[in-house]
Each structure stands twice: as C-alpha cells, then as structure tokens.
Amino acid sequence: MSYSLPDLSYAYNALEPFFDEETMRIHHTKHHQNYINNTNSILERTNFSSLSIEELMSIFNEISLENKNVLRNNAGGHINHSLFWKGLKIGTILQGDLKSEINKQFGSVEYFKSKFEDIALNHFGSGWIWLVNQNGILSIVSTINQDNPLMGKSISGTHGNPIFGLDLWEHAYYLKYQNRRLDYIKSFWNVVNWDEASRRLSK
C-alpha cells in the first residue's frame, strides 16, 4: 500500500480571510505531497508498507531502519497534515462534552485559548502545537519538526491522541502573515473544526 494525498472537503479559498487560498494550495499540493512521496519511497520495500499511517505511528518506536529519522520527518508530516486539514472549517461552534472538559480542566475557554496561544508563540522554530487527550486529561503540548504525539514520548517528547493541531512551520503562514506569528495563531480560532475535534474526543 502506498499513501496518497487526501482530498480536502473544502475549496482552497474556503478559509479566507483567515487562511489564504495561495498558502492552502501550496501547503496541500506541494508540501504535503512531498512528505507522502518521501514516505512511500522509504517504505516501498519494507514490511511496514501495508500499514495505515495511524498504525505506523503506533509502532514507530519499534521500527529499526537505517533512515528512520528521514521516515520520522516525512511520515510525521503526512499524518500531521492529514489531521490538520480535517480539523479546519469555518462556522463550527465549541459545544458539548469538549467545551465542558475544556472549562473543567482549564478553568475557562478564554484561559485555554490564551495558554494555547502562549505555548505556540514561544515554540522556537518549526513544529506543531496540539490539544491532546492523555487518558482523559486534556493537555496542550508542542512537538518539534514533524513529530506527532502518536509516536510516543520516547520519540516526540510527549504522548496522547490529538484533538487538533496547529502547524507552526513558516510555510503554513508566511505568505499572508510574514513574521506576525501571533496574528496567525489567533486567526486559527476562526477555522477550528470543533465538530471534528469533538468527534476525536469521543473516540
């Protein structure tokens, strides 16, 4: 099995004016596709080629390959972006169990957003910031490069099932926001797909 670029459920301009059309098109068709091509090239003659990307992440710590770090960056890039695209949509509302858990565990939605923004802004260099479910505990964590919490703590420095994540690589925002990373981070709240986030919480 080889991985393929997932279709988006929306047009490239659907997240305007918060995420611009040109960035979305390049991000999806160029950057994500490149991660997939590299992952397929590494896995094509291995015993791991039949695994789904989620299965691959779950056993990543056990994989022994000469180019494991290259696979880590590229397979991580594939799953990170796959989660990212599905987690974006304008017009959804934070409600239900997810809203209750955020209020319960962070004190308020406003404090949760402020903490998420602060951790994202202070993440040095490229990476991702995540809201994850760690056995019923919601945590805000960051990972470097294309690491994913599903890789486990020994690989990514953290763990948990992602509820949603924000791409902090410059290619995700620089065409529109240049060096205004905080503006990009704050704009994210306008495009979070809370319906998908709630579904992931209930898994």
Curated annotation (Swiss-Prot):
Cellular component annotations (GO), alphabetically ordered: cytoplasm
Example of a GO MF term: superoxide dismutase activity
Source taxon at top rank: Bacteria
Cofactor comment text: Binds 1 Mn(2+) ion per subunit.
Catalytic activity, reaction form: 2 superoxide + 2 H(+) = H2O2 + O2
Residues engaged in binding Mn(2+): H27, H81, D167, H171
Entry EC no(s): 1.15.1.1
Class of the enzyme per the UniProt entry, highest EC level: oxidoreductase
Cofactors (names): Mn(2+)
Known function: Destroys superoxide anion radicals which are normally produced within the cells and which are toxic to biological systems.
Binding partners and assembly: Homodimer.
Protein name, entry field: Superoxide dismutase [Mn]
Source organism of the structure: Buchnera aphidicola subsp. Schizaphis graminum (strain Sg)
